[in-house]
């Protein structure tokens, strides 16, 4: 439900093609996905970057392969596939906030409140005046930087962080294999999309371990 409500807020982004945001860097990621489609499944070499370099040295693979797979499967232009990918995981991330708060507090009301806050506002605007002034009609910062500046990979990595933390919390609490596996997959998804997101996860993780509930004894 949280995912669907968030999708309603950003519905135009799911079908967007080329935007008029000239400060955006998203054309780089769209071009990468198009290059990957034309040289599927692995180009090995990218002649257009740094006077030529290995394709896997350029950027984490998650967004490029995700965009390429959507374009190939749905017949979308790479630009539309890119926006679908980033919009989907933006909504996924808001649902992830709900999951993290629900797991940590056991409160459905608190989880809904935090998810709504993440979707509708940015507390940083209270303290960071330049960011507040840069935001169109106080659009949430995470959505603004994705649309205006093309930070799709960064925001996708950020979307996976609450999922990774929620399942890590459950893994520390229960020691069961399922949450451990889901936590590992979510952490891998963070790193696979953006290294800044991976850095944020590395900062949050010790805090999570410090605040995680006492481990339950393992059942015989």
How does the language model describe each region?
Residues 10, 14, 177-181, 203-206:
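Alpha-helical hydrophobic membrane-insertion segments
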Residues 8-167, 189-199:
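Active-site lumenal/periplasmic loops and adjacent helix-entry segments of GT-C-fold
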Residues 36-40, 171-172, 210-217:
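Hydrophobic residues in alpha-helical segments
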